[in-house]
Amino acid sequence: MTAPQTPSSNFLWFLPTHGDGHYLGTSNGGRDVNFGYLRQIAQAADQLGYFGVLLPTGRSCEDSWVVASAVAPWTERLRYLVAVRPGLQSPSVAARMTATLDRVIGGRLLVNVVTGGDPVENKGDGVFLSHDERYEVTREFLNVYSDLLSGKTVNVAGKHITIEDGRLLFPPVQSPRPPLYFGGSSDAGIDVAADTVDKYLTWGEPPAQVAEKVNRVRAVAEQRGRKLSFGIRLHVIVRETNEAAWAAADDLIRYVTDDTIAAAQKVFARMDSVGQQRMSELHGGRRDKLEISPNLWAGVGLVRGGAGTALVGDPQTVAARIKEYQDVGIDTFILSGYPHLEEAYRFAELVFPLVKSLHAGNVTPLRANTGPFGETIANEHLPNAKQAVKP
């Protein structure tokens, strides 16, 4: 079978700061996810040619900002997709964190805007807002955050956020700011995305459903004079033959019991995330009909929240499925697989030769001479511009 020639795309990998292993739903084959292991995955992704890595966020994960700042110096080209959390962070503090990390790692920061879809976890973090209120906060947050990163002074009195004389002294390296990635399948989420972000993300639904969502988001954005790009979040299980790939998929959930599935689905059911609801509906908690679309397998979502589907097959088959998503407008693929170190190699070695990358043409312009030049004055002003010494 000859693989179709695919259009250009960016491929990102994943740093599993919430755990890793050979199997789901068990500690058998589990792996110690320490700094050395995360660094190893990042360095492998860098050397293999991935565009970047996603760092997850939430109470089940290590802090993504701390991990990114620790791992990034060990890589050269790899970008880091790190989450800001409207409602948990002040937009001014988040802007300073963003600018600082972007400067420290040389313009390799990507920003993932995460509103949060689990009311129980949100309350544990001190957020007692309804679904739509969270998106109201996200909109206000992003307006302030983007203005600060673009060098503007911000004075705003919103429903949820009030800022007086907000300023960012030290700008990010990327101009006007690092790219903003965002996923939200509800009407409120799409409304915010159309006005504020650069790349809209979806979880790995079948191509027809992804096409419907992409067309809807694109139409809303175009009505408002904006143009978005689109990405998808998927797992991958690629082997040299289709038979070996499907055997690996079955093996991944060999220890998952019905009780484990029921417990996981109970947690997912409490969430008010429309995206999570759509993921759960793909399999309905049943393990007998997991191939929901050709080579798209929903087994991961039986016990894992968020991204719950995987592309399964040999390299040519997986490349063909990737092209189906590209044909409906997807240009960025955020991927993962178990264990994450080994699967990063498999995908890169087996599939990268069959797909094109647009890395070189997808770099945000960088600022030159961003300073600072000398210590700030009274913690308020940048030093005066350098003046020529009079003779």
From Swiss-Prot:
Domain of life: Bacteria
Pfam families: Bac_luciferase (PF00296)
BP terms from Gene Ontology: alkanesulfonate catabolic process
Record EC number: 1.14.14.5
Catalysed transformations (reactions): an alkanesulfonate + FMNH2 + O2 = an aldehyde + FMN + sulfite + H2O + 2 H(+)
Gene Ontology molecular function: alkanesulfonate monooxygenase activity
Keywords: Flavoprotein, FMN, Monooxygenase, Oxidoreductase
Gene3D superfamilies: Luciferase-like domain
Listed InterPro entries: Alkanesulphonate_mOase_FMN-dep, Luciferase-like_dom, Luciferase-like_sf, SsuD_RutA_monooxygenase
Alphabetized PANTHER family for the sequence: ALKANESULFONATE MONOOXYGENASE (PTHR42847), ALKANESULFONATE MONOOXYGENASE-RELATED (PTHR42847:SF4)
Cross-referenced NCBIfam families: alk_sulf_monoox, PRK00719.1
Functional summary from the UniProt entry: Catalyzes the desulfonation of aliphatic sulfonates.
Family: Belongs to the SsuD family.
Protein name, as recorded: Alkanesulfonate monooxygenase
Gene expressing this chain: ssuD
